[in-house]
Amino acid sequence: MAGRDRDPLVVGRVVGDVLDPFVRTTNLRVSFGNRNVSNGCELKPSMVTHQPRVEVGGNEMRTFYTLVMVDPDAPSPSDPNLREYLHWLVTDIPGTTGASFGQEVMCYESPRPSMGIHRFVFVLFQQLGRQTVYAPGWRQNFNTRDFAELYNLGPPVAAVYFNCQREAGSGGRRMYP
């Protein structure tokens, strides 16, 4: 496959760290305010405090989707021992609508990276039908691949990620001369 090495999901190691290779078959649009998320773009923590608007493509409302948002770099990219950290989980999103029409299983938790540049990944799966998904007991050490297998979701149909790092002035120790 010729373009595989230029796929931003491969270059950004989302494919590998979070997902296996897949073919995008559905449109997924994520935006925070007026900023659309594109693969590898950088957003500041102050821009992502509120739940994003998520629009799902598809052909009809009788097809349902599951959206997962994870941080594979928690607590730090050099030692991601909490990989993956689950920030948001929404199921039963009807095709052609958005996440606000789905069932929120885990509420949105805004990214607050403390060290290094973190990737925040949105993954969309097509469901076989409406189904009951149980909230994981905790957010840390979530595994998108295992989750998809547990609920028989198959490969992802879309994914997008952004980078985010701590903003200057958002806490931490200050040194004064």
Swiss-Prot record:
GO terms for biological process: inflorescence development; positive regulation of vernalization response; regulation of flower development; regulation of photoperiodism, flowering; regulation of timing of transition from vegetative to reproductive phase; vegetative to reproductive phase transition of meristem; vernalization response. Expressed in leaves but not in shoot apex. Belongs to the phosphatidylethanolamine-binding protein family. The lineage of its organism: Eukaryota, Viridiplantae, Streptophyta, Embryophyta, Tracheophyta. It comes from the Eukaryota. InterPro entries: PEBP, PEBP-like_sf, PEBP_euk, Phosphatidylethanolamine-bd_CS. It comes from Brachypodium distachyon. Pfam families: PBP. This is Protein VERNALIZATION 3. CDD domains: PEBP_euk.
